Amino acid sequence: MISLNIEKTFGFISKEKVSAYEAEVKAAQEMLEKGTGEGNDFLGWLHLPSSISKEHLADLNATAKVLRDNCEVVIVAGIGGSYLGARAVIEALSNSFTWLQDKKTAPVMIYAGHNISEDYLYELTEYLKDKKFGVINISKSGTTTETALAFRLLKKQCEDQRGKETAKKVIVAVTDAKKGAARVTADKEGYKTFIIPDNVGGRFSVLTPVGLLPIAVAGFDIDKLVAGAADMEKACGSDVPFAENPAAIYAATRNELYRQGKKIEILVNFCPKLHYVSEWWKQLYGESEGKDNKGIFPASVDFSTDLHSMGQWIQEGERSIFETVISLDKVDHKLEVPFDEANLDGLNFLAGKRVDEVNKMAELGTQLAHVDGGVPNMRIVLPELSEYNIGGLLYFFEKACGISGYLLGVNPFNQPGVEAYKKNMFALLNKPGYEEESKAIQAKL
């Protein structure tokens, strides 16, 4: 299970200040548990891990097997929370070069519907021309522009290449239980469907079929993922004392740093496989907290790569930042630095050391340098990359986000600002019903 260390923040805020949040955190947790806070229609994620049945997981695994048995490639069509959670888990657990391996134990997973790039979609459809592919269409409404557009293209291509009957078997819809374009299409075509619960918002949906089905198709153990999340649900429960509750401490610490003028949180990893965990985290916290002219800005870096781009700014730029480092305790493989007789690169002092030891010293050295440079640091230790640990990490961030949003004084479960660009886009595209908006926006151009 993960652990949290906040000691490297105490040169900037006091332990007593963090402890003083206990009453506020308790109130926030009660709002979550009793459903008395804003956004209480979207609390289905709170006890989701412990409520997922074995039968539900078996159904997901059976459907995943159908896709694995009948597809070389599976396209996950979704945007935001409809794909980021799945991608975060899949990329964290996959071999870095799965794409290039000749022997594959699961279909190649590709993502679509998360942009409107014509080149991306054209190149994807070209790649799929000689492939046995399937699609997981993830959309509660079925009318989200990016995803609906991609699915329209992929549905037609799948039917043209594989025939309607096979397409019916290898297209799965994850959507609303009763309504929406995706539900209507799925019922009409006879697709296998899974339900997105009404009370779970997209960015909190990784432990619903939204995330679990693609993760299972990719060959990973969703039973263990859910078990890790369920254990973290207990560890972060409202009955756990404040000082022992990692989600409570993380939420309190980041809010105290925010109140002390630290407006930007940078999520740091020293393992490139965690890149999409950071992308998922940015949406989770950005959409949950960025409203009412408030909110910590969530940013991320992949070290040591980004030490050669963002390192200068972090070390000596404006002191409005703090870092949360995901530290990986144990890696999967072992590789030692070889001895070289010529030693032209001067690296013989590392000969015989594991590459991971070099990476860990880079991590420690970076943390010390950044703290000395005025950047508070929190550290989340992940024992190893496994389904169980990743499940726990995701739930930890979700629970802390709910608490943190209420500490901040916002509704953590809505995202009204996301609609602004859509209204402008629809007006510019002359979508029926947007005539007045179209006139108004044309006057601005």
From Swiss-Prot:
GO BP terms, alphabetized: gluconeogenesis; glucose 6-phosphate metabolic process; glycolytic process
Cellular component per GO, a single term: cytosol
EC number: 5.3.1.9
Gene3D superfamilies attached to this UniProt entry: Glucose-6-phosphate isomerase like protein, domain 1 (3.40.50.10490)
Active-site residues, as the UniProt record annotates them: 287 (proton donor), 308, 422
Keyword terms, alphabetized: Cytoplasm, Gluconeogenesis, Glycolysis, Isomerase
Protein's pathway: Carbohydrate biosynthesis; gluconeogenesis; Carbohydrate degradation; glycolysis; D-glyceraldehyde 3-phosphate and glycerone phosphate from D-glucose: step 2/4
Domain of life from the UniProt record: Bacteria
Catalytic reaction(s) noted: alpha-D-glucose 6-phosphate = beta-D-fructose 6-phosphate
Main location: cytoplasm
Compartment annotation: Cytoplasm
Keyword Metal-binding: no
CDD domains named among the record's database cross-references: SIS_PGI_1 (cd05015), SIS_PGI_2 (cd05016)
A GO term for molecular function: monosaccharide binding
Enzyme class: isomerase
InterPro entries: G6P_Isomerase (IPR001672), Phosphoglucose_isomerase_CS (IPR018189), SIS_dom_sf (IPR046348), SIS_PGI_1 (IPR035476), SIS_PGI_2 (IPR035482)
Family listed: Belongs to the GPI family.
Biological role: Catalyzes the reversible isomerization of glucose-6-phosphate to fructose-6-phosphate.
Name of this protein: Glucose-6-phosphate isomerase
Gene it is expressed from: pgi
